[in-house]
């Protein structure tokens, strides 16, 4: 209702406006060559405005035609960028759900645009984690080293890759960079530990293993134990028996030991009493029971086989470790 009223008022205003203009309008004579055109001032103004608008439309149309190739190029470029972005997201999704081969295929086949900007980092990430050879991985991770989002992940992986290539100095540098960004990443600590061991930087090695002990990474205990045994043997070769004993005691305090390390420690440290050796062995057996420790227990103590059996099996679960208990009985001939 209101709109209808507004339209009526508008038409009335136009009618009275034109009537008013016509009342005061004056004649105008336009001379063009030998012709005299008689018109009114109002009509002349209207025709002038129409001519101006027509010229503007024609000029605008010509500009559009001239810019048409560039407009088409921009349109297709945007379409390609959107396609590439979609492909990056799709490749990333495939990688997350474990389809690494499909993610790699999408990344290599569909993505080539340099205009992806932020998405280029995700592109390089997919290419880095799915590349098959070490050099390609290193190349892609190097591109991510300046990315705030991926700098830690790139540094951590570059450390591993350079370690695999036996470039321990470079591996150490990248592992330290990753460590400065995140001190609690156990995988990076393990890489750093390996680097220090290969470079014989034992004080730094011990600092890292002290941190690793807090993570209870049982799968790496044998390797760490071997490193401590290696340090001790090197010290013995250099006639530094006291240092060797000190390293072995550090390993035992951190629960990094096996039967070989314990036997080497017992033979090296003649100040240990039988009770001290027994206590260490019982703790080692509680953490990682093995027949080799039973053998070592029998070797260093004067207890009977029955007493050894009772001492050691009391820390075992009779149901869970039933087979192992039977193996101990067989070894001790009980």
Curated annotation (Swiss-Prot):
Q: InterPro entries from the xrefs?
A: HemY_N (IPR010817), TPR-like_helical_dom_sf (IPR011990)
Cite the Pfam families for this sequence: HemY_N (PF07219)
UniProt keyword Nucleotide-binding, yes or no: no
* Regions that span the bilayer: 1-21, 46-66
The UniProt entry lists membrane topology as: Multi-pass membrane protein
Q: Name one GO cellular component term.
A: plasma membrane
Keyword Transferase present in the record's keywords: the answer is no
**Localization:** Cell membrane
Tell me the keywords, alphabetical order.
Answer: Cell membrane, Membrane, Transmembrane, Transmembrane helix
Please indicate which superkingdom the organism of origin belongs to: Bacteria
- Principal localization? membrane
Signal sequence extent: none
Q: What protein name applies here?
A: Uncharacterized protein RP472
